[in-house]
Amino acid sequence: VGSEMCIRDRTSDAAYEERATLFGRSLHRDARTDAQLLQEALTVAQKADVIVAALGESSEMSGESSSRTSLDIPDVQRTLLKELLKTGKPVVLVLFTGRPLTLEWEQAHVPAILNVWFGGSEAAYAIGDVLFGAINPSGKLTMTFPKNVGQIPLYYAHKNTGRPLHEGKWFEKFRSNYLDVDNEPLYPFGYGLSYTTFNYGDITLDRTSMPMDGSLTAKVILTNTGSRDGAEVVQLYIRDKVAESTRPVKELKGFQKVFLKAGESREITFKITPDLLKYYNYELQYVAEPGAFDLMIGTDSQHVKTATFVLH
């Protein structure tokens, strides 16, 4: 927004370019009111087959000394988005942001959301490639997106609680939960969609007991179950179940980006060594301690397959 960059032409039709370029090749600040700009946008949207709504934060809203008390998109933008959806035309939300936002309303009402952060001078070309289907996206989130600002801090590698909520439960009295929202994020760490789908088989381990000077191999079958070729980021997480110091419920220990043709399956392998299990203890010694570990492989930090092994 406000850039001289335009999405590259998908046709050499000069008439198409004249129709598509409604306000010149760049946008500038002016004195029009929000109501005037809203009406102008709706007038243009009525002529479109598909609406691409570029909304979110400006770059000045992120970074040092740029805190916010709300993580919703600005009110005037949500008003515009609601009006665009009322047209009945397909709407794609292209989201510019420098931080996780609360997008529960958008998730429930907008058919497609493309999070683009703050791209550089070539970002428009990449966005255009994804929107037009020239590229099958395979990116994954490096931050957790909450449902509500009240859930913050919210991150995947948190410590366990002494009163955990039972799996599958939304609320239990005197457990670690909220009265008005469940504990889960809107989009977990490592989340990301594609124009195809992938299926993970169960994890197999070549051994379930590993000595301090040994290793083990974890394998999983990954299948592209969709109709398009695509890439998947296979993520490896490990949990130290009992340690001298409290350990996170899971930690990212590795990942592989795997390209599969439609219908193709492949065996994905991770080598596990004691070095992957080490942490700094109270004496600041970098150690791996004997005990049980959960090994998780999946598409993001919440949707994983699990196997258990013992280090001795």
Model-derived features: positions:
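Secreted, periplasmic, or luminal enzymes acting at the cell surface/secretory milieu
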Residues: S3, S12-R29, F96-A231, Y237, ...
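Short acidic, flexible loop segments centered on an aromatic residue
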Residues: S227-E244, K250-L252
